[in-house]
Structure formats: C-alpha cells, structure tokens
C-alpha cells in the first residue's frame, strides 16, 4: 500500500525516535530529537505500508487514512536480481586486491547506481533566472506534473516503486533491531548501528539467521545459486548479503574509547588518543582541527 495518513496524539514508546520531521506535513505541537518526532498533536504523512505498520508498533497514536493506493507484492524480475548479485560478487572479489582498485571502484559504483537509477526524481520545480530578479523557482502545476509523469513513464525502464520499497524494507529491518537494543544504541545510520557495551548479541545473531533463511528460500524459489548471495573476498571470507557484521571482532580499530555525535552523518571518535571524524562533505583530514572531542560542535 501507499498511504496518505493523518496521525493524532502521537508519542514515541522508545528512547530512540523514528519519524523524520522532514517527511511530515502540517505538524502541530511537535517535539523533536535531532529532526525526529518525539511527540506531536497531529501531522500528515505519505508513506508505505511497511513504514505505516512500523509507526503503529513504535508510537502511541490515533490515525485517519486519507488516501490509499495498492498493488500486489512480487519478487523483482529474476534478470534484475541476477545483475545485482553479479555486481555484488564482483565488488566483493575485487575489494582489497592490490592492482584491482579501479575494477573495485567501477563495480561498487555500478552496484550502488542500481538503487539510484530507480529513484531518480525527474519531476522538479522549474528554475528560472532573469537579470532583474536573479534565480527563482516556479512550482509545477498539477497538469504539468501529470504530463511530466506520463512522459517519464514512457522513458523509464525501472519502476520507481523498486527503490521506494527497498528503502522501506531496509529501514524497517534496521529499526526493528534498534528498538530491541534501544537503550544501548548511541548512533545508527542507513546500514549500521553503534552500540554501548553490554548489549545482547543474540538479537543480532537471531536477525542474521532470519536473513540467511530468507535468502536460502529465495535462492531455491528463483533457482539462483546461493553462492551468488554469499561471495568470498580475497581472504576467503564469505559475505552474505544483508547480514550485520560485527566490526569490533575485526580488531581494536573499531572499538572506540570515546564517541560523540551532533546528528546524522556528523560524528567523531577517539581511539588510542587519535581523533577521527565522519561529517558529510568534510574531508577526514578535518580531524586535525580538533584538539579534543569537546571541540566537535
């Protein structure tokens, strides 16, 4: 389902919060944590069935469905799945191989581009420039949007829904683990979770077993070799698609002495007295400007 929903009397049940303020309209009485809604009197959202059911499980709320569009679930085309897996196999086999840096970069770019190709938004407001007023944007009318969508439908070869629902499933899979590890989560991104010591590792292990079973089922159902879902790297280690890997087990490098974050894509760590930063748009060398983590603001 694709839904337009009005939520009322909304309050999160967990320490972490999940509804992005930027994805909501007409917010009344909102309280926020790093751009995510803690509670609100009301707001409207356009969202998938995956996101809708996740919100109902993590927030106390009332709701009214304003619009509802439906389609039948099915697997992606087998040819497309096999192409995705081919890029994943190549990327994994070229990673950390001396002399194959260019090949690795190319395969990684192709692998990542498969998602971007399905969610490129071609329906944009018209940007206008004149010598008197400078730059401005003119919102498209409904008729212009419909015309643009019809034209785009004739040119596009991938469904926009591929990317939308892949994102929804990935977000749901990540956040279902976050709510079980709630008080131990200090940071999470699109594909990773940073945790305090003392968390229950069985939660991650159980999730990984769940993914392994699903992949085995899909491989058998679609008659695709299971090896394509779990290629080996140059060191002979298998990397099954979709599993959480514990970086701490790979050495002290990923066990931080100190960690600080100012929000999504903005954090710094200290290991053995050395500071490293991860900030969108800022080079790693920017860490030289910090004498301590207290300076990271």
Annotate each PLM feature:
Residues 1-297:
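Conserved acidic
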């Amino acid at each position: 389902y694709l839904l337009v929903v009005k939520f009322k009397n909304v309050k999160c049940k967990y320490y972490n919060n999940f509804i992005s303020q930027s994805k909501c309209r007409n917010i009344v009485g909102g309280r926020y944590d790093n751009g995510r809604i803690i509670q609100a009197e009301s707001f409207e959202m356009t969202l998938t069935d995956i996101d809708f059911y996740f919100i109902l499980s993590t927030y106390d709320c009332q709701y009214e469905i304003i619009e509802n569009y439906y389609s039948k679930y099915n697997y992606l085309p087998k040819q497309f799945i096999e192409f995705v897996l081919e890029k994943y196999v190549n990327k994994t086999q070229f990673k950390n191989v001396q002399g194959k840096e260019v090949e690795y970069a190319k395969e990684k770019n192709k692998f990542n581009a498969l998602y971007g190709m399905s969610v490129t938004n071609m329906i944009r407001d018209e940007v206008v420039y004149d010598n008197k007023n400078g730059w401005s944007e003119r919102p498209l009318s409904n008729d212009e949007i419909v015309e643009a969508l019809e034209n785009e439908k004739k040119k596009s070869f991938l469904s926009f829904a591929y990317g939308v629902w892949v994102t929804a499933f990935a977000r749901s899979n990540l956040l279902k683990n976050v709510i079980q590890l709630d008080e131990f989560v200090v940071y999470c991104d699109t594909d990773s979770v940073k945790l305090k010591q003392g968390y229950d590792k069985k939660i991650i292990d159980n999730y990984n077993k769940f993914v392994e079973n699903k992949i085995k089922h899909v491989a058998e159902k679609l008659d695709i070799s299971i090896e394509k879902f779990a290629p080996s790297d140059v060191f002979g280690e298998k990397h099954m698609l979709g599993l959480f890997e514990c970086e701490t087990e790979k050495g002290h490098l990923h066990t931080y002495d100190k960690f600080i974050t100012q929000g999504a894509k903005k954090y710094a760590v200290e290991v053995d007295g050395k500071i490293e930063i991860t900030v969108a748009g800022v080079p790693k060398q920017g860490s030289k400007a910090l004498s301590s983590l207290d300076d990271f603001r």
